[in-house]
Regions:
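Hydrophobic h-region of N-terminal signal peptides that target proteins for export
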Residues: 7-17
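Sec-dependent signal peptide recognition
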Residues: 1-7
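Acidic (Asp/Glu) and glycine-rich low-complexity loops/linkers
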Residues: 16-128, 136-145, 151-158
């Protein structure tokens, strides 16, 4: 009887470990001199943009979550489906942070949360798929196209 109880507890703990979410974070940065607008395209996950009067670069921290996958499988999902780029295009910077959804798979949807710091004077052009948006301290023009989720832009950011 004890053997069955121990075996049951061992099996339950293994199945619990197998279904934990995999998490990692990535960082991006780009010199912001001459950048007037930051164009941001996101998918599932929240977006937070903070304007900083002393910032000389655009800094991004991107916590990534892949639910229900062990590390090896999660890394395969990240390598094959994650789009995470920060590039300059003239006087604009383009930030893309999302998982390519054209490839369907089992399990929960992976997400990438974007935490972005920009010079306070830049404008923002945001296309958001799903998730909350918080913008504060940004003095430039702000355009938001939001698929779903809440948006918060304090009056001083307008």
């Amino acid at each position: 009887m004890r053997a069955f109880l121990v075996l049951g507890m061992f099996t339950a703990s293994l199945s619990n470990a197998a279904w934990r979410d995999y998490q990692e974070a990535r960082d991006l940065a780009l010199d912001a001199r001459g950048v007037n607008t930051v164009e941001i395209v996101t998918g599932a996950g929240s977006l937070e943009v903070r304007g900083n009067p002393n910032a000389r670069k655009i800094s991004v921290t991107a916590p990534i979550q892949v639910p229900g996958k062990n590390e090896e499988k999660a890394r395969k999902v990240i390598e094959s489906r994650l789009v995470l780029t920060l590039e300059r295009d003239g006087d604009s910077a383009a930030l893309n942070g999302y998982f390519d959804s054209s490839r369907w798979g089992w399990g929960g949807s992976p997400s990438v949360r974007l935490e972005v710091e920009v010079p306070e004077s830049v404008g923002l052009d945001i296309q958001d798929g799903a998730g909350s948006i918080k913008i504060r301290g940004v003095l430039g023009d702000i355009i938001v196209e939001d698929g779903s989720g809440s948006s918060m832009v304090p009056a001083r950011s307008l």
